[in-house]
């Protein structure tokens, strides 16, 4: 499978998750679960309440994928738009 075909499969897979996305509200009660074994380190969640495992380059981030936060040195960048016009975002070098 060439890189273009892999990219198309990637977008198709991402669309499946995007359709099942439900945006989370910020309810900062500070009763956070401890994080461990984070491949890309840790970061504060989108509300600034709890430490969470960060995601790495090429991973989905932002509200598209459970409000995932990019690792240090990366930024959550717009990749395109889903069917409902919401932005698809992935972690890229800052």
Curated annotation (Swiss-Prot):
Tissue: Expressed by the venom gland.
Subcellular location: Secreted
Residues annotated as signal peptide: 1-22
IGFBP N-terminal domain residues: 23-94
One GO CC annotation: extracellular region
Cysteine-cysteine disulfides: 19-47, 26-49, 32-50, 38-53, 61-76, 70-91
Domain of life (superkingdom): Eukaryota
Main localization (coarse): secreted
Keyword terms of this UniProt record: Disulfide bond, Secreted, Signal
Protein name: Venom protein 59.1
């Amino acid at each position: 499978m060439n890189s273009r075909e892999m990219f198309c499969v990637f977008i198709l897979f991402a669309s499946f998750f995007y359709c099942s996305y439900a945006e989370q509200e910020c309810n900062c009660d500070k009763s956070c679960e401890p994080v461990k074994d984070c491949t890309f380190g840790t970061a504060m969640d989108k509300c600034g309440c709890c430490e969470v495992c960060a995601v790495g380059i090429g991973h989905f981030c932002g509200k598209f994928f459970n409000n995932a936060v990019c690792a240090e040195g990366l930024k959550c960048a717009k990749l395109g738009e889903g069917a409902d016009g919401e932005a698809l975002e992935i972690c890229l070098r800052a």
